[in-house]
From Swiss-Prot:
Keywords: Abscisic acid biosynthesis, Chloroplast, Dioxygenase, Iron, Membrane, Metal-binding, Oxidoreductase, Plastid, Thylakoid, Transit peptide
Domain of life (superkingdom): Eukaryota
Listed name of the protein: Probable 9-cis-epoxycarotenoid dioxygenase NCED5, chloroplastic
Residues in the signal sequence: none
Record field: catalytic activity: a 9-cis-epoxycarotenoid + O2 = a 12'-apo-carotenal + 2-cis,4-trans-xanthoxin; 9-cis-violaxanthin + O2 = (3S,5R,6S)-5,6-epoxy-3-hydroxy-5,6-dihydro-12'-apo-beta-caroten-12'-al + 2-cis,4-trans-xanthoxin; 9'-cis-neoxanthin + O2 = (3S,5R,6R)-3,5-dihydroxy-6,7-didehydro-5,6-dihydro-12'-apo-beta-caroten-12'-al + 2-cis,4-trans-xanthoxin
Subunit relationships: Interacts in vitro with VAR3.
PANTHER family, sorted: 9-CIS-EPOXYCAROTENOID DIOXYGENASE NCED5, CHLOROPLASTIC-RELATED, BETA-CAROTENE DIOXYGENASE
Originating organism: Arabidopsis thaliana
GO MF annotations, alphabetized: 9-cis-epoxycarotenoid dioxygenase activity; metal ion binding
Pfam families noted in UniProt: RPE65 (PF03055)
One Gene Ontology term, aspect cellular component: chloroplast thylakoid membrane
Tissue: Detected only in seeds.
Known EC number: 1.13.11.51
Length: 589
């Protein structure tokens, strides 16, 4: 989400404890347990929302606590202290009002962060991990995966996408593996740790309806009195990871990227918010694309408040930014992903839009616009402005992710591969319809302005496929295979599918039993690779019976399990990953 807003409740910190008897997620009975083992029945305080009763109270299962510094307000003057007390009083009243109404499942923390979606504490490097099987000799570097991991317990609405960014890393050298996980120290998280409470708003979980407006007013009031500072960004950096310009970048579309450094022993340290030496002043979406031949990075930035609602830009391999190309849109549109070909960028303008005025009507600002016709914009990669943009309509098409795109000169078409999701806004707004994510081929004719769409997998073997990739060495070129998470039973991932994009043939790899994973990351075998699928699939897998997590390494040709790395602590289900080879690690800026 790209809502750059801020706010301030004041709850207790998470105890990060989980009971193995309640592991099924999402379920209200799934167990995330906090500092207290019994429900709190304290009287609400008039001056601190930290005394508000917890939303979640579950049995305690021993687990390390996060280290949170004592609240430091020593720099505040008497006026600021008085303002803080008054605003806390107002927020306590707001929370009382919110607690009188049930939360929809899409923002209820008892659903959103239960079971193995629940957060974990940081883990310092653990080396010489147990390995079943043999790690292929060609794997030399670090596999990293990003995810949402809230440090503080929610006091109100919370969506899975709202959590603080945490990167999990497995470093592999000569068949030996180590593991660590660390929060990305965003400006948001640093301030929250200083004040001992989540003072920034949750863009999806809290900013909706009249209470969302009230939270924004509280936030701006706190900023006015100098109780917080949002000028250095409000993002969580929890979604994407990319290695570019000698830097590992953690990203979410509500802020600039953050540079994270991998240390020699496999630990992680946040360097800071990265603006490409002052060239980048706006947020960047979490799915930039790197051309495997030119090594350029392509990106978008969208704004939900003011025009231009969308901008396109690129970076040279040396990190030099191009001028922004403003893309004309009638309204702010969710732009989570896009695609590139050898000569074009492919930009989806779909039916999930932002309408902030709906908050005054008590509604969510994220909505499905049934009157809008979805379309794709095809823009030359080196365009100086949007005058060369060709728009092709593709009705009723919503792809949260696009896996690849390429040009078909013989038919004057651009071919786009994506998972078409219905209902389009079901991730954000509660609905009764069953969610479907259908792998599709969308053909955009640049001469006629017409489009066609076909389902790639036959109906008899149709399944929800979300999160995955093609061989990134062929990004923007025609690919035969895609590796995609089997999101069943939704939202869990029971395995992954290797799909032949031409024939629709599907080969599945299931984790088995009560094991579930996430995004399958394809790692090419190396320069000596014999074919497009010559490589390995890497994915974190969690066993909901033993409550243990592993890294699985699967042969991408045969789909046979090559090695299993036993991890020292639980890895929650998360988002997107990357791999940094050992040579690049040595060259980090």
């Amino acid at each position: 989400m790209a809502c750059s807003y801020i706010l301030t409740p004041n709850p207790t910190k998470l105890n990060l404890s989980f009971a193995p008897s309640d592991l099924d997620a999402p379920s209200p009975s799934s167990s995330v347990s906090f500092t207290n083992t019994k429900p709190r029945r304290r009287k609400l305080s008039a001056n601190s929302v930290s005394d508000t009763p917890n939303l979640l109270n579950f049995p305690n299962y021993p687990s390390p606590n996060p280290i949170i510094p004592e609240k430091d307000t020593s720099r505040w003057n008497p006026l600021q202290r008085a303002a803080s007390a008054a605003l806390d009083f107002a927020e306590t009243a707001l929370l009382r009002r919110e607690r009188s109404k049930p939360l929809p499942k899409t923002v209820d923390p008892r659903h959103q962060i239960s079971g193995n979606y629940a957060p974990v504490p940081e883990q310092s490097v653990k080396s010489s991990l147990s390995v079943d099987g043999k790690i292929p000799d060609c794997i030399d570097g670090v596999y990293l995966r990003n995810g949402a991991n809230p440090l503080f317990e929610p006091v109100s609405g919370h969506h899975l996408f709202d959590g603080d960014g945490m990167v999990h890393a497995v470093k592999i050298t000569n068949g030996d593996a180590s593991y660590s996980c660390r929060f990305t120290e965003t400006e948001r998280l640093v301030q929250e740790k200083q004040l001992g409470s989540p003072i920034f708003p949750k863009a999806i979980g809290e900013l909706h309806g009249h209470s969302g407006i009230a939270r924004l007013m509280l936030f701006y009031a706190r900023g006015l009195f100098g109780l917080l500072n949002h000028k250095n960004g409000t993002g969580v950096a929890n979604a994407g990871l990319v290695y570019f310009h000698d830097r590992l970048l953690a990203m979410s579309e509500d802020d600039l990227p953050y540079q994270v450094r991998v240390t020699d022993n496999g630990d992680l340290e946040t360097i800071g918010r990265f603006d490409f030496d002052g060239q980048l002043s706006s947020a960047m979406i979490a799915h930039p694309k790197i051309d495997p031949v030119t090594k350029e990075l392509f990106a978008l930035s969208y704004d939900v408040v003011k025009k231009p609602y969308l901008k396109y830009f690129k970076f040279s391999p040396e990190g030099e930014k191009s001028p922004d190309v403003e893309i004309p849109l009638a309204s702010p549109t969710m732009m989570h992903d896009f695609a590139i070909t050898e000569n074009f960028v492919v930009i989806p303008d779909q039916q999930v839009v932002f309408k902030l005025s709906d908050m005054f009507l008590g509604k969510s600002p994220v909505k499905y616009d049934g009157e809008k016709i979805s379309r794709f914009g095809i823009l030359p990669r080196n365009a100086k402005d949007a005058s060369e943009m060709v728009w092709v309509e593709s009705p009723e098409t919503f792809c949260f992710h696009l896996w690849n795109a390429w040009e078909s000169p013989e038919t004057d078409e651009v071919v786009v591969i994506g998972s078409c999701m219905t209902p389009a806004d079901s991730i954000f707004n509660e609905c009764d319809e069953q969610l479907n994510s259908v792998l599709s081929e969308i053909r955009l004719n640049l001469k006629t302005g017409k489009s066609t769409r076909r389902t790639i997998i036959p109906g008899s073997v149709q399944m929800n496929l979300e999160a995955g990739m093609v061989n990134r060495n062929l990004l923007g070129r025609k690919t035969r295979y895609a590796y995609l998470a089997i999101a069943e039973p939704w939202p869990k991932v029971s395995g992954f599918a290797k799909v032949d994009l031409s024939t629709g043939e599907v080969k599945n790899h299931f984790y088995g039993g009560k094991k579930y994973g996430g995004e399958p990351f394809f790692l090419p075998r190396g320069l000596e690779s014999d074919g497009e699928d010559d490589g390995y699939i890497m994915s974190f897998v969690h066993d909901e019976e033993s409550w243990e997590s592993e890294l699985h390494i699967v042969n991408a040709v045969t789909l046979e399990l090559e090695a299993t790395v036993k991890l020292p602590s639980r890895v929650p289900y998360g988002f997107h990953g990357t791999f940094v080879n050992s040579a690049d690690m040595l060259n980090q800026a």
